[in-house]
Amino acid sequence: MDKGNKHKSALSVQAGVEPPSQVNAEAIRNLKSRKSSFLSTPQYLEGIFEGNRTILSKAITLIESSRSDHQAQAQEIISECLKTPKGDLLPPLQGRAGEGLSGIRIGITGVPGVGKSTFIEALGKHVTGLGHKLAVLAVDPSSTISKGSILGDKTRMESLAIDPNAFIRPSASSGSLGGVARKTRETIYLCEAAGFDVVFVETVGVGQSETVVKSMVDFFLLLMLAGAGDELQGIKRGIIEMADALIINKADGDNLKKAKIAAMDYTKAVHLFPPSHTGWIPVVDLCSAKTHEGVPKIWEIILAFQTTMLQHGHFQRNRMSQNRQVFHQAIEEKLADQFYTHPGIRKQLLELEKQVTSGSLNPYQAVNSLFADR
């Protein structure tokens, strides 16, 4: 080895060059950003009441969090959003930021392939074009990865997604239907406090989600396809009976004739169902979300429903009934949370689960044993 280069190691060659940091500076900035993403309660409330979408989104994220401190703060925010500036509980139809404007919550369901995304965008653009502020939410307890199809639908609702009077939010989270429903309902409260006077709640997936959405909205709309029976569409009679309007989508081109025939059939069918306690007979109509044909009429149907229900007091009574249901659900959730997080119960549960699994104890005996000393 050349004596002149004898002591030139890799380190000595790099002499004078500042060594790289041991910690990724960008990672630190991201960590600090995440820590600071949660605001104080007054900051959340100020942003929500001003209609700040960024803060509204952060507040919804706070609601979705499972951390106990986040949940406590979320409840503070929700309580304030449900009050008037005087501190009184809100009348059923008055939004905090709406200054007395009547709002309406609309549930929208339909089988896959019915054109729900296109329909929501078409009706949504019509609603915002009339000067309303629209929030689009979803209820989907089924997906742990995609968080509901509305995430994909949002990219298909390009025009509505960039509408300054529209706010699109994916499903609260995957998990139990009750948990998702609670978070969706709380998201509705925040959106209304932020000035969104029209809220669409979309059901994603199948099963009991339609019933849950019905329990949190004022008007329930069922999208149908022409040329397919109920069995092929996977629609149960109970879901049809829940609907305030049955809209046959894709009524255009070669499909228009079949859509008209289907409309006549469904019109006959709804008259055979037991009458609603409100006296409202579900309206059957056609539309083409693709061409926007019939979309304005659907909004007129919704307004006619709201006017009729308000005149007879059904609208208010429905909201009050929903509040009572929320109250009982909240009790059940609180009791379950306190029960399952109790240290003594958690330990005993694990022991009893082993005995039930092994067959040395049947489930009913295990339950009796769990509550024997309580």
What residue spans do the PLM features occupy?
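Short, structured coil segments at secondary-structure junctions
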Residues: 216-217, 241-242, 280
